[in-house]
């Protein structure tokens, strides 16, 4: 659903009481619900086994997203395969997203651990760290079994 933009969420008196609250208004549906569900299902595969962004998975939640990797243009034409922009845009819980975030890294450094920077192995882990903190701050309830850190490290 596309929401109408709002600048004010609420009017609050000096003593902290809420005088008036402004609820979100839906402007229109961007996609049919069935189409949106198909898109979320397809984007969940990106963070599943065999996907390009397993490193973006947050324990206790299904994450859906899309990776991006682009070579930067050379001044004289063509593309420089050593200079790239990588990204990951993700949402969680995937079934009913409460949080959406895009992480973009411009010319990430090549390292022994990441000799070929891509959206999934550079921006994915950053999304994960942000999403873990946001889940706590937003008090999001896990939608999947929570894996212990030991079980996660053993499964990798």
Residue map of PLM features:
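Active-site beta-strand/loop architecture of penicillin-binding DD-peptidases
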Residues: 1-27, 43, 47-139
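Short, highly charged C-terminal tails/helix-capping segments
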Residues: 141-156
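Extended, non-catalytic substrate-recognition/exosite surfaces adjacent to catalytic cores, especially
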Residues: 17, 24, 28-30, 36, ...
């Amino acid at each position: 659903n596309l929401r109408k933009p709002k600048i004010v969420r609420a009017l609050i008196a000096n003593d902290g009481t809420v005088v008036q609250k402004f609820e979100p208004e839906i402007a229109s549906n961007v996609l049919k619900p069935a189409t949106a569900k198909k898109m979320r299902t397809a984007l969940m595969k990106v963070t599943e086994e065999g996907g390009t962004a397993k490193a973006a998975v947050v324990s206790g939640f299904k994450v859906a997203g899309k990776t991006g990797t682009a070579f930067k243009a050379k001044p004289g034409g063509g593309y420089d395969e050593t200079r790239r922009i990588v990204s990951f845009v993700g949402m969680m819980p995937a079934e009913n997203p409460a949080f959406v975030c895009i992480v973009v890294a411009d010319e990430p450094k090549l390292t022994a651990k990441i000799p070929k920077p891509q959206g999934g192995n550079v921006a994915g882990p950053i999304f994960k760290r942000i999403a873990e903190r946001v889940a706590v701050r937003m008090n999001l309830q896990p939608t999947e079994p929570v894996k212990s850190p030991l079980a996660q490290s053993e499964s990798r």
